[in-house]
């Protein structure tokens, strides 16, 4: 991809809405974790030979590594949810929404580009602002809660109709975090080779 000028990409998993909400098959998180490890090793090896301006990166992997090594994450992986505060999405018709994953959900509309709209703030969507690891029963006792990047409120909103369930990738997080820690500890991958997207 770098040969074509693409340096940042996303290995996007499914958001549980539409047809993806019908879970006829279980996701094989072990195989998914193997794939993430392979991608991380590829990125590491590529970037090791490249100059920093030519580095490639994948959003979820770089965020997991930053979470482990720096204890930081970007807007889509933070708690409380930053939707409507630090991020806004614009639909094709000019409607504003708290998040690109919530476009079309009237509960999360902020108005329109041509009309009145809510000013982005933590108070714009109290339910999203109140959703944090400490308010989700399963998450508040999880040993991975401070490193887990799977905190997207839209995932649980579409899957359960509320904001107070663990993310559908909770099990994946429990698998991938120790694997990436092992890769970092053994120096198979180096955190400095994974810039944030």
What is each stretch, according to the model?
Residues 1-83, 89-93, 105, 109:
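Radical SAM enzyme [4Fe-4S]-AdoMet core and its adjacent flexible, acidic
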Residues 103-197:
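Flexible mid-to-C-terminal extensions adjoining Fe-S/redox cofactors in radical SAM and related proteins
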């Amino acid at each position: 991809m770098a040969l074509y000028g693409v340096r940042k990409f996303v290995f996007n998993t499914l958001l549980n809405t539409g047809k993806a909400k019908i879970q006829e098959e279980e996701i094989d998180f072990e195989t998914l974790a193997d794939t993430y490890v392979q991608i991380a090793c590829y990125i590491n090896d590529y970037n090791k030979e490249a100059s920093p301006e030519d580095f490639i990166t994948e959003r979820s992997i770089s965020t997991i590594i930053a979470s482990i090594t720096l204890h930081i994450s970007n807007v889509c992986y933070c708690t409380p949810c930053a939707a409507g505060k630090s991020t806004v999405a614009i639909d094709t018709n000019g409607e504003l929404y708290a998040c690109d994953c919530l476009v079309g959900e009237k509960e999360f509309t902020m108005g329109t580009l041509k009309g009145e709209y809510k000013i982005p703030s933590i108070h714009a969507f109290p339910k999203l602002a109140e959703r944090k690891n400490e308010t989700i029963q399963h998450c508040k006792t999880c040993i991975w809660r401070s490193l887990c990047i799977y905190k997207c409120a839209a995932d649980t909103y579409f899957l359960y109709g509320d904001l107070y369930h663990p993310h559908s990738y909770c099990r994946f997080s429990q698998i991938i975090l120790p694997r990436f820690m092992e890769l970092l500890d053994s120096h198979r991958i180096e955190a400095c080779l994974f810039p944030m997207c």
